[in-house]
């Protein structure tokens, strides 16, 4: 089943920031998103489930400092953030 990709406004702003600032990181984000679309909560970037306020969301490592935060639902994958660490 194919899921559609949905971007929260903050995540969209993060993505646009990376387009202007660092193409290498942008390429990594794109790789992680493609892997989420293919493999769900398994694969590259050390996927881990988040807890507390972010229960239901997962994160993957973009760099040592930055994480891709997302949630997989029946019909969509929601990207919540792709800059900084979760909760920042």
Model-derived segments and spans:
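A short, surface-exposed loop/turn module that caps and links secondary-structure elements
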Residues: 34-61
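Enriched for short, Lys/Arg-rich terminal
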Residues: 2-4, 10-27, 31, 44, ...
């Amino acid at each position: 089943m194919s899921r559609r990709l949905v971007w929260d406004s903050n995540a969209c702003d993060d993505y646009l920031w990376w387009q202007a600032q660092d193409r290498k990181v942008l390429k990594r984000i794109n790789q992680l998103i493609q892997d989420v679309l293919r493999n769900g909560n398994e694969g590259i970037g050390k996927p881990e489930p988040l807890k507390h306020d972010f229960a239901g969301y997962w994160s993957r490592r973009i760099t040592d400092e930055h994480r891709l935060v997302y949630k997989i639902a029946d019909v969509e994958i929601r990207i919540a953030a792709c800059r900084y660490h979760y909760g920042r």
